[in-house]
Amino acid sequence: SSNEVTGNYTTKGIGEVLAAINAGLIADSFGDTPFSQAALPELANGQPQFLTPELDKQEAIYTAIMEYLDAAITDLPKGDKSDEIGEYDFIYKGDGEAWLKLAYGLKARYTMRLLARSSSKDADLQKILEYVDKSYTSIEEQAAFSIYSATNLNPLFDFQWSRDGLAASKSYADKLIERNDPR
């Protein structure tokens, strides 16, 4: 990639951590879902490569998350030749060490997610402890946007916890009842 050529490994690592976070949101929210064939670039004819992407197993998405995080853990300590990312990074202002701690925290999280299917739980529990030791040591280090306040909610939080207006309309419910639809 161009970041590897120019030596902007912190920027690349940040992208890998963000990819892992977003893949985690998808896997945690939907379970089995399109992932490996989803959101791929368009072909020359303007059509997506996969109009009906296949479902990936949630566990496969978690495996991809771990690959993103492993790559980030390799890239982040290498630093950037330019310091351009700092002003564009709303979370850690380009601090590669802070992003590295986040990557290790996420490794702990997703190792725990996979623990139920692990064939070596004791080893994975030990890994979790090692990842936690390399992650945050205080609440001040958490990944948080400083742009949100009581009147400016994080959109994911707002969607998850403020959905009082999302309900079936009376006409829709009446149609379901009329047709003996169990939904």
Q: Model-derived features: where do they sit?
A:
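Structured, solvent-exposed acidic/aromatic patches
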Residues: 1-183
